[in-house]
Amino acid sequence: IDNFKRLNDELGHSAGDEALKALAATVSKTLRPTDMVARYGGEEFVVLLPETPVDEGQQILTRLQRSLSGGLFMHEQKQIFVTFSAGITAYRTGERIEDALERADLALYQAKRAGKNRTLIG
């Protein structure tokens, strides 16, 4: 989630929790039954899109971004706008999963540096 630390610092951890819930609700409505999502740490998640080409995966995550940023959630009578950045990669047969996660993580940080609320391929 973009600017998650600032959200927590300025509005409190309950606002951060609500942002995570808003993201989870959006994910559950958008992803396919075969897709999986897991919290990776803090405000970072891993989304597994089995049998999905990387360009199609990028389109799926872009749809997720539009769905999340298309709606606001309320926290203590304030409307909160939430976005997220994502890095995407394809798992290469025989590689360590950590290597794929590292590529996705690098792409994530490139997306954040490039202005946030975007998905880049790593």
Where do the PLM segments sit?
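Catalytic core regions of nucleotide second-messenger enzymes
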Residues: 39, 68-84
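Hydrophobic pocket-lining residues within nucleotide cofactor-binding pockets
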Residues: 1, 52, 73, 91
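A structural signal for short, well-ordered beta-strand segments
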Residues: 45, 84-88
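Residues at secondary-structure transition points
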Residues: 10, 14-18, 55, 74-77, ...
